Amino acid sequence: MICHNQQSSQPPTIKTCPGETNCYKKQWRDHRGTIIERGCGCPSVKKGVGIYCCKTDKCNR
């Protein structure tokens, strides 16, 4: 699996994730504004954090 792993508005970067079957994109708001985090897997999140998990290479853009 190949997933994007940059945060918020940083330039796109990718990571190869051996053994993973998902990529994720998490989004939440704090005093800095909207924060976006991308990576491998499909983590559980706290209330108030949006999560999108997908199963194809680079699908978490």
UniProtKB/Swiss-Prot annotation:
Lipid metabolism: present as a keyword of the record? no
Q: Does the keyword Secreted apply?
A: yes
**Which Pfam family is one of this chain's hits?**
Toxin_cobra-type
Keywords of the record, alphabetical order, are: Acetylcholine receptor inhibiting toxin, Disulfide bond, Ion channel impairing toxin, Neurotoxin, Postsynaptic neurotoxin, Secreted, Toxin
What does the entry state regarding organ or tissue expression?
Expressed by the venom gland.
Give disulfide pairs as residue numbers. 3-23, 17-40, 42-53, 54-59
Cross-referenced InterPro entries:
Snake_3FTx, Snake_toxin-like_sf, Snake_toxin_con_site, Toxin_cobra-type
Q: What is its main location?
A: secreted
Molecular function (GO) terms for this protein are: acetylcholine receptor inhibitor activity; ion channel regulator activity; toxin activity
Can you tell which superkingdom this protein's organism belongs to?
Eukaryota
Where found, per UniProt? Secreted
**A GO CC annotation given for this chain:** extracellular region
Q: Which family does it belong to?
A: Belongs to the three-finger toxin family. Short-chain subfamily. Type I alpha-neurotoxin sub-subfamily.
Q: What does this protein do?
A: Binds to muscle nicotinic acetylcholine receptor (nAChR) and inhibit acetylcholine from binding to the receptor, thereby impairing neuromuscular transmission.
Q: What is this protein called?
A: Short neurotoxin 2
Q: Which organism is it from?
A: Naja haje haje (Egyptian cobra)
